[in-house]
Structures are given as C-alpha cells and as structure tokens.
C-alpha cells in the first residue's frame, strides 16, 4: 500500500493512511522502548539532503535509519551542487542510482517534487517553504497519545500563520477531523489557497476551520501550538515580526483563558523561551525582551509536551521510511 511512495506533502496520503502510519509509529515506539529490533530496512542506503540546518530532523532521520538497519549518508550544502553546478533533476537521477531512499530538507517545495519525480526512489520531505509533513506525523501522534483519539479535538495555532508548520497543521488537521483555529495578524494569515484546500478536507472529515486575529479563539482549545516568529532566512524581518506578534505570546495570562485545564502545549522547536541562546541575548539587548513566542513558565509547565513531541519525530520518521521502503505486509485500509 505504501511501498515505493514518496511523502512530499500531507495530502499524499489519505486520512486512513495517515491514521495507520500514526498507529504504526506508536507500535515502533514500543519496540524501541522494549529494545526489540526492527530492522525493516536492512542494508538499505538512505541519502539525507540538508540545504537547511537542523537538529531534530537530522537526528531523527539518522537514528531512525540506523534502528531500521539502513545506512544514512548526510549531504549538506557544502557536499553537493544541488541546483548550483548541477541541476536538481541530474542530481536526482544520480542519487536515485545509488540510494534506496532520499530525505530532503530545503528551501523550495518544487525542489523536493523534482527529486521525487526524477530519482525513481521514495523521497521524504523533511521541510520546505510550504509544507512540513514529517513534523505533522509526530504532532498528531503526540496528540493521539495524550487524548486517545483525534476526531473533534480542537487545536489552536498562535503566531505566524503563513509558515510551513501552520500550513501543514491547517491541512492535516482538516484531513484527520481535528478542528483547527489559526490565530495571527491579518498580514500573517495562511494563503487563501491553503485555506481553501483545508476547507475542502474539513468538509469530508466534518472538522471546523477558523482563521482569526484575536486570542479569544484559544478558549475552547485542547491543544495550543506556537512556533518561532522569524523563520530561517527571514532574520531581516525580526523587528517587524516582534512588533506584529508581541501581543500573540503564549503566556500564563493567555492560557488561563482555556476552559480545558488538561490542554497540551506544543512547539516544533527550537523555541525562544529564555535567555540561554545567543539569539535571545541579542533580542534582549536590542528589544529588551526575555522571551518571544512563549514564556519559560508555559514552555516548562505540566501542560507542555514539547520534548515528547520532539522524540516522536524519530518514531514517525522511522515509520514512514519503513512503510514506503521496507516491503512490509500492510493490509489495505
């Protein structure tokens, strides 16, 4: 059912297929915890292409590949000539002749689409400018682990509503039957074509989509999600974003409005919640702020599941690689 398929964006898989993958990841997590080997990709070779730097995505793909018995090979921006001295199409054909599967984390969705088309191998999107599908598997796995189900839960995303994480949450939630509220300034709301796509899937799953500017949309949330205010490559926009998003910070006063006191707080990381990074020390010096998108109090509260969420990147990446490359017996669903 999954064999040989790429995972470039969330709509590549149906609702039932995504739910199957989430349950498969939960199973693989149990195997990992019980030290039971699961080498479904024994002696496979995996190319890990990273145009953008990464902590969780690189660590997750590397660890997942090794656990599955595969050999991961990291290819950073200084290692290959992707689109510079060699076209992406030519690179795809070369890598496809040497590797069994390819991960890509980069700047353009069109690049990962070309890799998948011309390599002839399963390609997995580790993040592009538009979508972050492997993050979504981890996010909704984490949500299911905490609530036992997904249908009819409400997730409120607060912050930069037009970045890849917001796009992916909006569409994936709509596919899976999760109500999604995006709370952001009008200038940072999801593109209309993304909203239209999400509403199409929400009609099928009977979920609700809400795009708004006020934080009152948090009251009925079961999940509160935020992300950095300035994405990689947008550093020149820092002052403008802080001005736009300062009132959208997730802090104790904001979360006290939430009716469900057992809500969970999520963040795909890294997070600027304290002064323990060089970036935040500069922010403190230039803008006199100790925290940005979330306060340290909320980030480290009992409601926060950010580190479970990060761990689940590895389990879900493992699951999608095994399902698409492992020649496993998976009944049709």
Curated annotation (Swiss-Prot):
GO terms for biological process: arginine biosynthetic process via ornithine; citrulline biosynthetic process; L-arginine biosynthetic process. Carbamoyl phosphate binds at residues 54-57, 81, 105, 132-135, 268-269, 313. Pfam families: OTCace (PF00185), OTCace_N (PF02729). It catalyses: carbamoyl phosphate + L-ornithine = L-citrulline + phosphate + H(+). Pathway: Amino-acid biosynthesis; L-arginine biosynthesis; L-arginine from L-ornithine and carbamoyl phosphate: step 1/3. GO terms for cellular component: cytoplasm. Disulfide bonds: none annotated. Coiled coil: none annotated. GO terms for molecular function: amino acid binding; ornithine carbamoyltransferase activity. Keywords: Amino-acid biosynthesis, Arginine biosynthesis, Cytoplasm, Transferase. It is an enzyme of class 2 (transferase). PROSITE patterns: CARBAMOYLTRANSFERASE. It is found in: Cytoplasm. It comes from the Bacteria. Belongs to the aspartate/ornithine carbamoyltransferase superfamily. OTCase family. Reversibly catalyzes the transfer of the carbamoyl group from carbamoyl phosphate (CP) to the N(epsilon) atom of ornithine (ORN) to produce L-citrulline. This is Ornithine carbamoyltransferase. The lineage of its organism: Bacteria, Bacillati, Bacillota, Bacilli, Lactobacillales.
């Amino acid at each position: 059912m999954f064999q040989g398929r790429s995972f470039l964006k969330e709509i590549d898989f149906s609702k039932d297929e995504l739910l199957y993958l989430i349950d498969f990841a939960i199973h693989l997590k149990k195997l990992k915890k019980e030290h039971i080997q699961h080498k479904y990709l024994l002696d496979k070779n995996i190319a890990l292409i990273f145009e953008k730097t990464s902590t969780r995505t690189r660590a997750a793909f590397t660890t997942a590949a090794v656990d599955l018995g595969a050999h991961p090979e990291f290819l950073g921006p200084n290692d290959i000539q992707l689109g510079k001295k060699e076209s992406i199409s030519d690179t795809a054909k070369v890598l496809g002749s040497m590797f069994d599967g390819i991960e890509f984390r980069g700047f353009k969705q069109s690049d990962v689409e070309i890799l998948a088309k011309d390599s002839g191998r399963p390609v997995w999107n580790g993040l592009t400018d538009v979508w972050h599908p492997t993050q979504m598997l981890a996010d909704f796995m984490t949500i299911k682990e905490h609530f036992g189900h997904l249908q009819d839960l409400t997730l409120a995303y607060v912050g930069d509503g037009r970045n890849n994480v917001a796009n992916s949450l909006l569409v994936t939630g709509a596919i899976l039957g999760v109500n999604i509220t995006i709370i952001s300034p009008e200038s940072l709301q999801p593109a209309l074509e993304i909203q239209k796509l999400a509403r199409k899937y929400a009609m099928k799953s009977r979920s609700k989509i809400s795009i708004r500017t006020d934080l009152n949309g948090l009251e009925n949330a079961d999940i509160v999600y935020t992300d950095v205010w300035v994405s990689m490559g947008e550093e020149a926009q820092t002052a403008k974003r802080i001005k736009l998003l300062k009132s959208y910070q997730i802090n104790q006063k904001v979360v006290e409005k939430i009716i469900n006191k057992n809500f969970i707080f999520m963040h795909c990381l890294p997070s600027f919640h304290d002064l323990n990074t060089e970036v935040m020390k500069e922010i403190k010096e230039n803008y006199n702020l100790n925290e940005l998108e979330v306060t340290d109090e909320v980030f480290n509260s009992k409601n926060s599941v950010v580190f479970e969420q990060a761990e689940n990147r590895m389990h879900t990446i493992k699951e999608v690689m095994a399902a698409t490359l492992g020649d496993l017996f998976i009944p049709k669903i």
